[in-house]
Curated annotation (Swiss-Prot):
GO-annotated molecular function: haptoglobin binding; heme binding; hemoglobin alpha binding; metal ion binding; organic acid binding; oxygen binding; oxygen carrier activity; peroxidase activity
Modification N-acetylvaline, positions: 1
Binding site for heme b: 63, 92
Residues with N6-acetyllysine modification: 59, 82, 144
PROSITE patterns: GLOBIN
Phosphoserine: modified positions: 44
Name this protein carries in UniProt: Hemoglobin subunit beta
Amino acid sequence: VHLSGEEKGAVTALWGKVNQEEVGGEALGRLLVVYPWTQRFFDSFGDLSSASAVMGNAKVKAHGKKVLNSFSDGLKNLDNLKGAFAKLSELHCDKLHVDPENFKLLGNVLVVVLARTFGKEFTPPVQSAFQKVAAGVATALAHKYH
């Protein structure tokens, strides 16, 4: 991902304020509600029958936190996202057979949740930087599919 020094600073500063459990749980929950076909990868999570069931599901929240922990690791390796996400790409491609388009969807949902969480602090330039990072992570996760 090619970010200016200013963009890297904005991403790092805002990310330092992110509650990974809350934001991750909400982002994954919203993904499962807004794009219900993504639920097929989470059969073991129990009740996903309604928006309130999804958003209150402890397994969704826990996995959302795990997703953001990985995203956080990626932020430490912006110059080598493909390397940082190689094992996760392999897992999602070879074992889980996740449609790589879902990574883009999750990245966009994450940006929505960050905007909702941080309000005015999530300025258009900050959003632009996060969109670049989310796209870079999605590309890195899709790498093993090619």
